[in-house]
C-alpha cells in the first residue's frame, strides 16, 4: 500500500520496509502490523492530516494540549477571593510560591489525584524500589517514557506560568518552589527550585553522572531503531479519549502502552562512565528528596512572610511540611487548588479555582507594577 496516499501526503517514507510493516484500512483507522521483536504486534492508529501531529508542530498547540478534560471542573473565581489573593501579593515582601500539578493541567499535562487524574483510572506510578530492583520495570518505564516524550515536550507554558513569571519580574515573588518535573516554569521565564527534580535530565544511580534527556532519547532510538520507528508513527490520541488506543499520557510524561511493545528486545543504554543504571532525575514515590534541596526549601519557607500554594493537594509530606512550617512561623498562608488539600484545616485562605484563571484576574485588579503579559 502507498503510505503517502494513506497519510494524505503528510509524511513520506515512514515505513521503508514492506517486509516489516503491513498497513491495512479498517473503519477509518490505519491498522499496522509491525514486527516488534520476534513476532508481529497489532496496533491501531488514527490517520493524521496536515496541521496535525505529523504536520507543522511549531504552530498552535495540538488539540490534546488544550483538552479541558485534563483540567478539573471549577466555578469562576468570585471577586471576594480575587481581592483576598490580590492583598496577599500587595502586602507581602518575602512571598514564597509552591506550585503543583494544577498549574500544568491547563497545559494538557494530567495530574494524579483530581477526578480526571491518573489515579482515577487505577494507574499506579512506578516506585523508586521497583525501578532500582527490576530490569523489567526499567524497560517498561523507559519504553513508555520514550513513546510519550515528543507529546510531553510539545506542551507550552500556560496562563499560570506566564502570570507567575511576570509577577517574579515585578519583584512580587521572592522565591518559587515547584513539585512539577515538566520545566514549564523555566520556559515561561522563571527559575524555581525543582523539589522533585526534572525529567529533562537523566542520571546514573552508581556514579551520579548526568546528561540531557534529549541525548538519552537519541540513544534509545539508536539501539532500538525498528521499535522507535514503529512507535513514533502512532498518533496517541487525545487525553481521556476512548480512541486513544490504550496510550494515555501520564503526569511524568510517559504513556500507557501495551507490554507487547517492550517486554522483549527493548534495550536500555547504560552509563557511559561506569556502565551503571540510568534513571530520570526525578524523585519517584518511595524515594527521598536530596537533603541539601529539602533544607533549602524549608529555610525559605520559614523565612517567608507569605506562603502561597498553587495547584497542589499537598498530599506528599515534603510539600505539606513546607506549608505547615511557613504557617507556624507566622507567614500569611493561602492555597489555590481545585479540591481538598492536606492543609485545608490550618490555612486561613483556601480558594477553589483554576490557578491560571484567578492569577490573571488578580493582575487585572490593581497596580502590582507587573509587566504586560
Swiss-Prot record:
InterPro entries: DHS-like_NAD/FAD-binding_dom, NAD-dep_sirtuin_deacylases, Sirtuin, Sirtuin_cat_small_dom_sf, Sirtuin_class_II, Ssirtuin_cat_dom
GO molecular function: deacetylase activity; NAD+ binding; NAD-dependent protein lysine deacetylase activity; zinc ion binding
Active-site residue numbers: 196 (proton acceptor)
Binding residue positions for NAD(+): 100-120, 179-182, 311-313, 337-339, 355
Assigned GO CC terms: mitochondrial matrix; nucleus
Signal peptide coordinates: none
Top-level taxon of the source organism: Eukaryota
Enzyme class: transferase
Any one Pfam family match given in the protein's UniProt record, by short name: SIR2
Reactions catalysed: N(6)-acetyl-L-lysyl-[protein] + NAD(+) + H2O = 2''-O-acetyl-ADP-D-ribose + nicotinamide + L-lysyl-[protein]
Keywords: Ethylene signaling pathway, Metal-binding, Mitochondrion, NAD, Nucleus, Transferase, Transit peptide, Zinc
Function: NAD-dependent protein deacylase. Catalyzes the NAD-dependent hydrolysis of acyl groups from lysine residues. Involved in responses to ethylene leading to the transcriptional repression of some ethylene-responsive genes via the regulation of histone acetylation H3K9Ac. Negatively regulates plant basal defense against plant pathogens, possibly by suppressing salicylic acid biosynthesis.
Identification of the protein by name: NAD-dependent protein deacylase SRT2
Protein source organism: Arabidopsis thaliana
